[in-house]
């Protein structure tokens, strides 16, 4: 029944990689990378993103009470400067600079000031870090790495930038999108890292989105909040929340489109949808690359009384170790799913609940849907279990992409989350990774 972990690790990451167009990257942005020695592998561990024009910026940060030095510094810089006028971002991997006290904050400031100085940027650089918690950065290495990265700045090598921010990731994560707005075509690119400690609201995950759209700070903030809710706050790998996670979007206005100031305008809604598509693809890449994962799992909740309650139920299922273990074992254990629905905290009626397992994303599964018997099976009908062929169910769940669809019978709201199964490889990977 079980596939070998080695086979899975070879198969899954390749499905994440996507083609990208170097002529569709946002105008005015450059990236530079370097290997300074923070990573024992010798791989690149410094990334700089620079815009020739000052950017409006929006960002969301970890909700963990323990926040890393770069998170504290970047929040302060953004608030002090009203989220505008930024030209650069510096990221290091190989060290989280979290739980490092005053020295850690001093090191984050050094990274910020050195980057902006070398780039001759008028405003301090934002900072992100990722890696092991509780260790001071070797600043002699970091400072040399920043200087080296500045010399490599170019407009087309975003994939190297995505590689430079990886930690336990197996593959780089990059997505892009273009959209025609009033006054010109706008380009969007996003890179992110993350494979473990992934849980709403965000987790050990860094993401930077850059666009050449002209948009106000308030509109950019609203756009990012919407996009993150339906992407990074809708994924779960292991239920752990990190100290460092950050999502930031930079907009430099180089596309020449009509400046967006109204969140109800057609241009805003089109741009918001495009950014949401980019962040959703990146979020799904994180789940597909999750530590030890062999399955990409879509959880769809229908018939909730509110979207928020649907999200709570989906989250409860996605964090259940029993559900995730059963999926790895290709066991359609609907009882574990129903239990997770029941303890979610949402007031549901068990006698109204219907449930299906399916291969793929489950979009055609549920009440009033196609429900193709070749790709889906219903296991629960208004709280009553249905007799099913367990061998056929196991075959259905042998696919790399599977779905759990739950109908609550409470209303018309829906919610979707993405998660993965729980395997021996996850335990193995995290038993050898400090903090």
UniProtKB/Swiss-Prot annotation:
GO terms for biological process: L-arginine biosynthetic process; ornithine biosynthetic process. Coiled coil: none annotated. Substrate binds at residues 167, 193, 204, 291, 430, 435. The record marks 130-131 as: Involved in the stabilization of negative charge on the oxyanion by the formation of the oxyanion hole. Pathway: Amino-acid biosynthesis; L-arginine biosynthesis; L-ornithine and N-acetyl-L-glutamate from L-glutamate and N(2)-acetyl-L-ornithine (cyclic): step 1/1; Amino-acid biosynthesis; L-arginine biosynthesis; N(2)-acetyl-L-ornithine from L-glutamate: step 1/4. One of its GO terms (cellular component) is mitochondrial matrix. Its EC number is 2.3.1.35, 2.3.1.1. The record marks 203-204 as: Cleavage. Keywords: Acyltransferase, Amino-acid biosynthesis, Arginine biosynthesis, Autocatalytic cleavage, Mitochondrion, Multifunctional enzyme, Transferase. The alpha and beta chains are autoproteolytically processed from a single precursor protein within the mitochondrion. It is an enzyme of class 2 (transferase). It comes from the Eukaryota. Transmembrane segments: none annotated. InterPro entries: Arg_biosynth_ArgJ, ArgJ-like_dom_sf, ArgJ_beta_C. It is found in: Mitochondrion matrix. It catalyses: N(2)-acetyl-L-ornithine + L-glutamate = N-acetyl-L-glutamate + L-ornithine; L-glutamate + acetyl-CoA = N-acetyl-L-glutamate + CoA + H(+). Belongs to the ArgJ family. NCBIfam families: ArgJ, PRK05388.1. Heterodimer of an alpha and a beta chain. Catalyzes two activities which are involved in the cyclic version of arginine biosynthesis: the synthesis of acetylglutamate from glutamate and acetyl-CoA, and of ornithine by transacetylation between acetylornithine and glutamate. This protein may be expected to contain an N-terminal transit peptide but none has been predicted. HAMAP family: ArgJ (MF_01106). This is Arginine biosynthesis bifunctional protein ArgJ, mitochondrial.
